[in-house]
């Protein structure tokens, strides 16, 4: 199998996924998954698509990710891995789609408006 490319995005994070046959090595920005992400919960979030199709140690994955924080990056990586797996084998698509791994979460930070302290918070109003 050749190398398969996919892209995942979430908030301001962009993850580029390079998936190939292997024995389950996942590296992010040339470091291991466990070193890059501090929390065990985030690591399981990244591995969810692989666990769903029971292919946790069939593919080597190289990931370049930039922008955002840990959670946004992890969700971008999860989307990218799910998209790459669908390219490898289209029969994975229904189970991944059912779990919501192929849905791009389009929520972004709302912009700050002039005349306000934040996006929605106003300055204190005094009637008199």
UniProtKB/Swiss-Prot annotation:
Gene3D superfamilies: 3.30.230.10
Family annotation (InterPro entries): Ribosomal_Su5_D2-typ_SF (IPR020568), Ribosomal_uS9 (IPR000754), Ribosomal_uS9_bac/plastid (IPR023035), Ribosomal_uS9_CS (IPR020574), Ribsml_uS5_D2-typ_fold_subgr (IPR014721)
Gene Ontology CC annotation, any one: cytosolic small ribosomal subunit
Biological process terms in GO annotation: translation
Keyword field: Ribonucleoprotein, Ribosomal protein
TM region positions: none
Gene Ontology molecular functions: RNA binding; structural constituent of ribosome
PANTHER family (alphabetical): RIBOSOMAL PROTEIN S9, SMALL RIBOSOMAL SUBUNIT PROTEIN US9M
Family as reported in the entry's similarity comment: Belongs to the universal ribosomal protein uS9 family.
Name of the protein in its database record: Small ribosomal subunit protein uS9
Organism (species): Amoebophilus asiaticus (strain 5a2)
């Amino acid at each position: 199998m050749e190398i398969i490319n996919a892209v995942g995005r979430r908030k301001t994070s962009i993850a580029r996924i390079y998936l190939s046959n292997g024995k389950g090595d996942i590296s992010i920005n040339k470091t291991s998954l466990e070193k890059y992400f501090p929390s065990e919960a985030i690591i399981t979030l990244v591995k969810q698509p692989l666990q769903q199709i029971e292919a946790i140690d069939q593919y080597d994955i190289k990931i370049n990710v930039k922008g955002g924080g840990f959670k946004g990056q992890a969700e971008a990586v999860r989307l990218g891995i799910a998209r790459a797996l669908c390219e490898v084998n289209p029969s994975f698509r229904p189970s991944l789609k059912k779990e919501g791994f192929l849905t791009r979460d389009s929520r972004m930070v709302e912009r700050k408006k002039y005349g306000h302290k934040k996006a929605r918070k106003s300055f204190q109003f005094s009637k008199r």
